[in-house]
A protein has these predicted regions:
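Short, glycine/charged-rich "phosphate-handling" switch motifs in NTP-dependent
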Residues: 18, 30, 39
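Conserved H-loop
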Residues: 1-5, 7-14, 32, 34-35, 40-41
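Non-catalytic connector elements of ABC transporters
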Residues: 52, 62-192
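Conserved ABC ATPase "signature" C-loop
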Residues: 24-25
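Hydrophobic Walker B segment
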Residues: 13-16, 48
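Short acidic-hydrophobic catalytic motif
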Residues: 34-38, 46-49
């Protein structure tokens, strides 16, 4: 057993069996790399270990093992065992690579958010990154694999975003959605 301290998230994810994410000297969450990445318990952990789309919502009901969450008038499902919200105020979190982007007329399954508009397209070889402006004014990041033979979407194109409900994680709605994204200006991340 050994303890390795690093600020390199990729290094920690590939080397460790168990990771403790610390924030201001306190452990925010401890678990396997997959647990921390796929089901973070706080906005800090979600943002510190990669990019996250955190969408403010309200828990409006239950359906078996799922919570029903209202995201600006659009309903999605969230597994109860993936929710860390303590009341009806919630952030629904989805990683950019878990989203599927589609044209308005294309049928999709799972959770769906309609009425998006492509604001930016960055082709990076294996995938294309999209910034999609949603009707409530929030930009969502989508990483779409370039493996389906579909031509990339264009700036200005109207789209829907969908994903499997099991990919959603729920965070407390009173958290700072930007926690974990800032870099301390006094620290040089490349300094060893």
């Amino acid at each position: 057993t050994f303890v390795h301290v690093t600020h390199d998230q990729e290094e920690a994810m590939t080397m460790a069996d168990t990771i403790a994410v610390m924030n201001e000297g306190q452990i925010e969450q401890m678990g396997s790399p997959a647990d921390l990445y796929d089901n973070p318990e706080t906005a800090f952990v979600a943002n510190f270990l990669g990019q996250s789309n955190l969408i403010k919502g309200t828990v409006s009901g239950n359906d078996g093992d799922n919570k029903i969450v209202d995201l600006f008038g659009q309903k999605i499902s969230l597994r109860k065992d993936r929710s860390h919200a303590v009341d009806s105020s919630i952030y629904a979190g989805i990683r950019p690579e878990k989203f599927r982007i589609s044209r308005l007329e294309t049928a999709t399954s799972g959770n769906i958010l309609t009425g998006g508009k492509v604001e930016d397209v960055s082709y990076i070889g294996v995938s294309t990154q999209y910034q999609v402006l949603m009707p409530w004014g929030q930009e969502l990041m989508v990483f779409e694999q370039n493996d389906d033979g579909v031509a990339p979407f264009s700036v200005g194109e109207s789209v829907n975003i969908s994903w499997e409900p099991s990919f959603t994680f729920g965070l407390r709605g009173d958290e700072d959605a930007e926690a974990g994204t800032e870099v301390n200006p006094d620290e040089d991340p490349d300094e060893e």
